[in-house]
Amino acid sequence: MKVAECTTILVGKKASLDGSTLIARSEDGGREILPESFKVILPENQPRHYKSVLTGCEVELPGEPLRYTSVPNAHGKYGVWAAAGINEENVAMTATETITTNARIQGIDPLLVGEGLGEEDFVTLTLPYIHSAREGVLRVGELLAKYGTYEMNGMAFSDKDEIWYLETIGGHHWAARRIPDDAYVVAPNRLNIDEFDFESSDFMASADLQTIIADYKLNPDFEGYNLRHIFGSATVKDTHYNNPRAWYVQHYFDANLQTTPLDQDQPFIVHADRKISVDDIMFLMASHYQNTPYDVYGDQGTVTEKKRFRPIGINRNFETHILQIRNDVPAGLAGVQWLGFGPNTFNAMVPFYTNIVDTPASFRDTGSKFNLQSIFWLNKLMSQLGDTNFKLYGELESAFEQKTVAACYRVQHQTDKQVQELQGAKLQACLTKANQEMADLTFANTVELLGKMVEEGHAHMQLKYDLLD
């Protein structure tokens, strides 16, 4: 079974630099390399009857699905695992973030065993059928109530106005809250939602969730509801695996926060001291505790300190996306799926338009085996070479990333101006052409970087003996 542990970042439209809603997640796996691909699922290719590979759970799907983008596993042996996308109504979804639970709720509504739905399924069963972020929450809530789940998961939905974050609770329950427009969220692999208001329209939950809390005396707080306290965890593992990631992101946006990496009650809803850009998210998704003793590539800490906390940028990043719904362009241009394959510390993210019917071959045709024509496999090769001597290769990678992202920005700016009056198939053709241009320049720059790394590394091999003549 595929292992998936991720990091999610959400940014409201008034907190972002350009007024976009932004939902981002790194899809991280385990020891096995899980090749990823980028595809468009057309309505005629969406199944009408769905069957999960992992559990065999069968679901009859509604008619008239929407077109949507998807980042499925290339080999499919564990199922689709569509991960994230934006549909033709400019509604985005990312699923899922593996989260934690506790024995109290598991004794009431246990996770299913060998049945129900999970990360493999949720995007495929939800994204083609929703027309707003709120609809996404309600759709998943209905699926959980009917089919249940075998794992604890968090997921996010966005449209041009709203972002919602949902967490599953036990086998059939859930809770969700709308992210304030002027706030951001970082969600590591634990149950993250804290303060919860059952009376507010900015919160949604299973119909009987509040009753369960009361009937089983689950609330440890004297006032209000904190779902992390009620349904979540506060373990030693959280203090080194989860909490430090939230701490690093929150201190990046506000260095004056009075928290430590070990704190169990780091806030869910946070306000930055400046507007947040896509570039900020890219940096954080690639971060490894730079300028702290906990940076594995740094020179501040001891060997023990460098291995103490789990970073966001890690060898197990297999794909990372930032789903951007823009508010300053026509609807046909609004959806942008920033996408990077492989460890984020060594890749460059590409801003693909999502109003398309196909994707560039270098991102689409990954294949399950090593393939030098696939950007996924090139990025894996580059990251494993770069990891051998980060001090030597790190600046080369930074220059590559800036060069590539800047070139993609130029293509995006030019395309936005050129297609303002276009619609339908003509617009899609121009956006597809722009996507291909960005994919091609990213591929070429990646190959160029690999060449520079080989040239630079030649004289630094351990297998050497200096000439004496």
Tell where the protein language model's regions lie, with residue ranges:
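A contiguous strand-loop segment
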Residues: 2-119, 139-259
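Ordered core of a single globular domain
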Residues: 191-340
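Short, well-structured alpha-helical segments that form the helix of a local strand-helix-strand
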Residues: 136-145, 281-285
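Substrate-recognition/cap regions that form aromatic- and gly/pro-loop-enriched pockets
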Residues: 294-422
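Short, charged, surface-exposed loops that flank catalytic or proteolytic processing sites
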Residues: 129-135
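Histidine-centered catalytic/metal-binding microenvironments
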Residues: 400-469
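Short, well-ordered beta-strand elements within core beta-sheets of diverse protein domains
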Residues: 123-129
